[in-house]
Amino acid sequence: IQIAEGWENTARVMKEISIIRSMTNNVAEHTRAQYQLHTGYLPSGGVKYPTFGSIVASDFPIPKDDLPSFVSIGTPGNTIGSGFLGMSQAPFVVNDASKLPANVSKANRLDEQRFSGRLSLLEDLEGQYANKGAKARVEDHKAIYANAARLVRSPNLKTFDIASESNEMQEKYGKTAFGRGCLLARRLVERGVPFVEVE
């Protein structure tokens, strides 16, 4: 294999890389091709298929942990979703790897008692909604909020903080959106997240 000039670091680790040359697509429209790449199916009106990440998250959840099983980095508005697997298997989206994910830190004035009180109120409201015939949707919503609450309270939230990496390590990955995304992906995989995609 010949590696292009300027890719010397890649050449050094080629034994760790798999090159896929058999992947083709005859779909000319980008959105449909992206859907097929992520699900294995062309879009159809009747069925919304889950992305591969959602399937992996469903089959290999992180046991008793507070990190999501599927993280999608740098994909604002481009995620395919969890399809018929439900919202609990949807990707945890990180738009910008250089920042903590949106809405994961409690406000300074919000202590644990108030935080728990708000979650309790939410549970009461969801119970009322579920009794009106929306039980499946409420169960999905409850699972998402429970996961979010665990993450907000977790010491593992620092996994998302790539600023804690040395400047030298950040330079190795590159201080671009993609480079920062790959650095975050490495940190997540090291913590046991089974599926991470970087766009």
Predicted segments, located by residue:
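Ligand-binding pockets and gating/stacking loops
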Residues: 1-199
